[in-house]
UniProtKB/Swiss-Prot annotation:
This is CCA-adding enzyme. A single active site specifically recognizes both ATP and CTP and is responsible for their addition. One of its GO terms (molecular function) is CCA tRNA nucleotidyltransferase activity. Keywords: ATP-binding, Magnesium, Metal-binding, Nucleotide-binding, Nucleotidyltransferase, RNA repair, RNA-binding, Transferase, tRNA processing. HAMAP family: CCA_bact_type2. The lineage of its organism: Bacteria, Pseudomonadati, Pseudomonadota, Gammaproteobacteria, Thiotrichales. The gene is cca. CTP binds at residues 8, 11, 91, 137, 140. Catalyzes the addition and repair of the essential 3'-terminal CCA sequence in tRNAs without using a nucleic acid template. Adds these three nucleotides in the order of C, C, and A to the tRNA nucleotide-73, using CTP and ATP as substrates and producing inorganic pyrophosphate. tRNA 3'-terminal CCA addition is required both for tRNA processing and repair. Also involved in tRNA surveillance by mediating tandem CCA addition to generate a CCACCA at the 3' terminus of unstable tRNAs. While stable tRNAs receive only 3'-terminal CCA, unstable tRNAs are marked with CCACCA and rapidly degraded. It catalyses: a tRNA precursor + 2 CTP + ATP = a tRNA with a 3' CCA end + 3 diphosphate; a tRNA with a 3' CCA end + 2 CTP + ATP = a tRNA with a 3' CCACCA end + 3 diphosphate. ATP binds at residues 8, 11, 91, 137, 140.
Length: 369
């Protein structure tokens, strides 16, 4: 059996990037032989193994044959007679179809090194058209490698147009699209804009297509403050200007987690309260209530800090109101709900409206509305 370093790790090394993970392909081996050599299988229906010492992933070389629609519609062959070139040929782009053997020799049957040097994203083979996810991955690589300014090969653009006509993009799952979106957070504007240029955005992310202009420009995502943020923060910073009425649709489309959704919703509420000159006290009350930033002090603090971070990155926005006044308002409301009312003396059917009016009066006073 022979081992080859493949895929993104090789690409990144050739670009001068330290790879986060290293994936290996094994040629000339069976599953039983891998187990006999101490490798640990990690997938029930897929021959992927963990090296007993390095803990890196090793997969048997494979070929693929299209049998049905969608991302999973493939027949896979893991025979020990599959060659390295067979395995590399099934990969999406030439820059991902390069291998390095155990003697550090680069094996590049599809001229991926030339495309790396010329900053071109080019499909490895005509099989590119068989997997609709590859269109999304192409946009993701353009975003992920945005510092290198890759362009897409003309013949690949032509192939993508053919793929779109087949309707295959409609078979992509939200789970897979979420994974690609998160991986594209290095520069999501490039990710979505590339999909738009490929005429795929309206098919894959129709709601994002409607609010694309509200996502910051690509220079926003090149700011060190953004780059140093965690995934939860990056998602919120990217989508902070999404209208409240579109938020639930965006959540479903991007398959945002509860954590993502709560943080984004609270941050959007804070943004609107501080920036909207014409907002009313009742609208502010509904925003802070729906975003749960009265009860959840940690959520309020995290969202407010994230909004401050947004202002530092996007220095063209000047809030109409001081965030410290909002902080004082929230604290006053919390204390008022305990101290300013004798709840026992208020009829139950009037308690909710009485509390609501108290909060609105506090908002008016504190924010000078």
């Amino acid at each position: 059996m022979k081992f080859y370093l493949v895929g993104g790790a090789v690409r990144d090394m050739l670009l001068g990037i330290t790879p986060k993970d290293k994936d290996w392909v094994v040629v000339g081996a069976t599953e039983d032989e891998m187990l006999a050599n101490g490798f640990i299988k990690i997938a029930a229906n897929f021959p992927v193994f963990i090296h007993p010492q390095t803990k890196q992933e090793y997969a048997l070389a494979r070929s693929e044959k299209k049998t049905a629609n969608g991302y999973h519609g493939f027949e896979v062959n893991f025979s020990k007679y599959i060659t390295l070139e067979d395995d590399l040929k099934r990969r999406d782009l030439t820059i991902n179809s390069i291998a390095i053997d155990q003697n550090n020799k680069v094996i590049d049957p599809f001229n991926g090194q030339a495309d790396l040097q010329n900053r071109i994203l080019r499909h490895t083979s005509i099989a590119f058209i068989e997997d609709p996810l590859r269109v999304v991955r192409l946009a993701r690589f353009k975003a992920q490698l945005s510092n290198f300014n890759f362009s897409i090969a003309e013949e690949t653009l032509t192939l993508i147009k053919e793929l779109i006509k087949t309707g295959e993009l409609n078979h992509l799952t939200r789970e897979r699209l979420h994974i690609e979106f998160v991986k594209a957070l290095n520069n999501p504007k490039i990710f979505f804009t590339t999909l738009e240029e490929l005429e795929a955005l309206k098919i894959i992310f129709p709601n994002i297509s409607c609010i694309l202009l509200l996502i910051p420009n690509k220079s926003f995502f090149e700011n060190p403050i953004y780059k140093d943020s965690n995934i939860n923060e990056k998602i919120t910073l990217c989508l902070l200007k999404v209208p409240q009425q579109k938020l639930d649709d965006i959540r479903k489309e991007l398959l945002l987690t509860n954590k993502h959704y709560k943080l984004l919703k609270a941050s959007i509420a804070i943004s609107k309260i501080l920036e909207d000159r014409n907002i009313t006290a009742e609208e502010i009350f509904q925003l802070i209530k729906n975003a749960n930033i009265i009860r959840d002090k940690n959520l309020f603090a995290e969202s407010l800090n994230l909004y401050k971070k947004y202002l530092k990155v996007c220095d063209t926005i000047t809030p109409h109101r001081n965030y410290q006044l909002l902080q004082t308002t929230i604290n006053t409301i919390k204390n008022a709900s305990i101290n300013s009312l004798t709840i026992e003396t208020i009829p139950k059917d009037k308690l909710r409206n009485t509390l609501k009016q108290l909060y609105i009066d506090i908002i008016k006073k504190q924010l000078k509305l």
